[in-house]
UniProtKB/Swiss-Prot annotation:
Alphabetically ordered keywords of this record: Chloroplast, Plastid, Ribonucleoprotein, Ribosomal protein
GO BP, one annotated term: mitochondrial translation
Assembly and oligomerization: Part of the 50S ribosomal subunit.
Annotated segments matching region Disordered: 1-26, 223-273
Ranges of compositional bias, category Polar residues: 7-26
Organism: Ceratophyllum demersum
Protein name: Large ribosomal subunit protein uL2cz/uL2cy
Superkingdom, natural source: Eukaryota
Alphabetized GO MF terms: rRNA binding; structural constituent of ribosome; transferase activity
Gene that this polypeptide is encoded by: rpl2-A
GO CC annotation terms, alphabetical: chloroplast; mitochondrial large ribosomal subunit
UniProt signal peptide: none
InterPro entries: NA-bd_OB-fold, Rib_uL2_dom2, Ribosomal_uL2, Ribosomal_uL2_bac/org-type, Ribosomal_uL2_C, Ribosomal_uL2_CS, Ribosomal_uL2_dom3, Ribosomal_uL2_RNA-bd_dom
Length: 273
């Protein structure tokens, strides 16, 4: 990713940076509108995900996570910005005339060829089942359920690693550090997701974050008691509790949020860090 630093002409541009090369020019048959009305609320209008709302209008890009164009080579025509994710996307023109978007693999350039199938080369951007990959292969867009499409390691810079194969299962090390079992028949894409330096981009001002649909963050200790367990008191008061809590009174900072007795507990060999 080519990051362009602004000249220091104003306080906001002094600390700002933008991506200077990747643009967005989506195809009409691969996009559709989506209605944003929740703004972090549930069906009753109660905030369940904080600091969300507003933002620029978006058109959703149809991403091919299944990669079911088997044994048909495709050429990367464009590399585009997607407002719905922090990774870039590639427009692929397949030999049979099909056109689809896929996640941009790191290092892929316009003109490269990608293909999916069972007996394809182990090269960047190709999709194939885990059973046909050698151990130590770096992969992304990994399926959990056969035929459902990739669900793991899809964010910018994400990469998983195939570390073992035994019986009907393959062992993967995920970006979170979790080690789990997945069926060897599930497919994945070779390589790492692009836009690795997304965390190096500085927005520079509050307005840029508003365009992304992110609202300001307010500390609970400066709120009223009716709004947060940390609120209230005279002046700068401590939280008044032994341990910090969420706005709903649950323990914060380290409390495990995964549901107990999930079906996939037996597939996780080592929980995430």
């Amino acid at each position: 990713m080519a990051i362009h630093l602004y000249k220091t002409s104003t306080p906001s541009t002094r600390n700002g940076s933008v991506d200077s090369k990747v643009k967005s020019n989506p195809r009409n048959n691969l996009i559709y509108g989506q209605h944003h009305c929740g703004k972090g609320r549930n069906a009753r209008g109660i905030i369940t995900a904080g600091h969300r709302g507003g933002g620029h209008k978006r058109l959703y890009r149809k991403i091919d996570f299944r990669r079911n164009e088997k044994d048909i080579s495709g050429r990367i025509v464009t590399i585009e910005y997607d407002p719905n994710r922090n990774a870039y996307i590639c427009l692929i023109h397949y030999g049979d005339g099909e056109k689809r978007y896929i996640l941009h693999p790191r290092g892929a350039i316009i003109g490269d060829t990608v293909v999916s199938g069972t007996e394809v080369p182990i090269s960047m951007g190709n999709a194939l089942p885990l059973t046909d990959m050698p151990l130590g292969t770096a992969i992304h867009n990994v399926e959990i359920t056969l035929g459902r499409g990739g669900q793991l390691a899809r964010a910018a810079g994400a990469v998983a690693k195939l570390i073992a194969k035994e019986g009907k299962s393959a062992t993967l090390r995920l970006p979170s550090g979790e080690v789990r079992l997945i069926s060897k028949n599930c497919s994945a894409t070779v390589g790492q997701v692009g836009n690795v330096g997304v965390n190096q981009k500085r927005l520079g001002r509050a307005g840029s974050k508003c365009w992304l649909g992110k609202r300001p963050v307010v500390r609970g200790v400066v709120m009223n008691p009716v709004d947060h367990p940390h609120g209230g008191g005279e002046g700068r008061a401590p939280i008044g509790r032994k341990k910090p809590a969420t706005p709903w009174g649950y323990p914060a900072l380290g409390r495990r949020s995964r549901k107990r007795k999930k079906y996939s507990d037996s597939l996780i060999l080592r929980r995430r860090k």
